[in-house]
Amino acid sequence: MNLYDVIKKPVITESSMGQLEAGKYVFEVDTRAHKLLIKQAVEAAFEGVKVANVNTINVKPKTKRVGRYVGRTNKVKKAIITLAADSKAIELFATADAE
């Protein structure tokens, strides 16, 4: 698996934006990726970033109905990335204070 295929997109929620002050960033990642691969991918994608810790969450698919048709949402894997104290911040998550 290529390192640039590991990170799919950032997760922008009220909870994830509240964790930015603590140096924690939330990304949706490939379901096959393990913690070491996620760490390498973040450090390769963002220059000057040092990862201290990686926590992962597997979100199960939910059953959804549209009329009489029943389907399921896709399963998702989220990664909570904690940056080291001497690391640069990830510029992808620009806050309103910076503008």
Swiss-Prot record:
One GO location term (cellular component): ribonucleoprotein complex
InterPro entries linked to this entry: Nucleotide-bd_a/b_plait_sf, Ribosomal_uL23-like, Ribosomal_uL23/eL15/eS24_sf, Ribosomal_uL23_CS
Pfam family membership, one: Ribosomal_L23
Keywords: Ribonucleoprotein, Ribosomal protein, RNA-binding, rRNA-binding
Protein name as catalogued: Large ribosomal subunit protein uL23
Gene3D superfamilies, sorted: 3.30.70.330
Organism per entry: Streptococcus suis (strain 05ZYH33)
BP GO terms, sorted: translation
Quaternary assembly: Part of the 50S ribosomal subunit. Contacts protein L29, and trigger factor when it is bound to the ribosome.
Similarity annotation: Belongs to the universal ribosomal protein uL23 family.
A GO term for molecular function: structural constituent of ribosome
Function: One of the early assembly proteins it binds 23S rRNA. One of the proteins that surrounds the polypeptide exit tunnel on the outside of the ribosome. Forms the main docking site for trigger factor binding to the ribosome.
